[in-house]
Amino acid sequence: MRPSLLRLASATSTQRGLKPNPMALLPPIPLYRRLLRAHRKHLPPDMRILGDEYIKAEFRAHRKVDNPAHLIGFLTEWQMYAQKIEGDQWVGDKLDEQKLSKMSDEQIQQLYELMQAIQNRGKEGGEQES
């Protein structure tokens, strides 16, 4: 076998198959800024205000998290959210039942409060237009 073919053959066997390379995890402050920029660029003003408030509250609440597993999970989910917003893949997207089943009661309560806030803003917006 020629040396170049030998190198090509060995290079493919050392890769991890068809799994995509994991995305690099952004540190908290650059991720926070990216999220706010994504909201400013891709969301309508009323949704942007609600989203910005939610992001600020969540990052404030997780400021003193010591558990690395919780921190990595938190940053990973927010980074995936940023990618969805930037790619306009979020419109009409439903919540994954598997993620919902893994949520704690407190997280489900937060989600319910967020849903109510969105619905109340929709009602207020409808009354103002009349």
Swiss-Prot record:
GO cellular component, one term: mitochondrial intermembrane space
InterPro entries registered for this protein in UniProt: SDHAF3/Sdh7
Keyword Transit peptide carried by entry: yes
Transit sequence range: 1-8
Keyword terms: Chaperone, Gluconeogenesis, Mitochondrion, Transit peptide
Database matches in PANTHER family: DC11 ACN9 HOMOLOG, SUCCINATE DEHYDROGENASE ASSEMBLY FACTOR 3, MITOCHONDRIAL
Protein name per the record: Succinate dehydrogenase assembly factor 3, mitochondrial
Described purpose of this protein according to its UniProt entry: Plays an essential role in the assembly of succinate dehydrogenase (SDH), an enzyme complex (also referred to as respiratory complex II) that is a component of both the tricarboxylic acid (TCA) cycle and the mitochondrial electron transport chain, and which couples the oxidation of succinate to fumarate with the reduction of ubiquinone (coenzyme Q) to ubiquinol. Promotes maturation of the iron-sulfur protein subunit of the SDH catalytic dimer, protecting it from the deleterious effects of oxidants. May act together with SDHAF1.
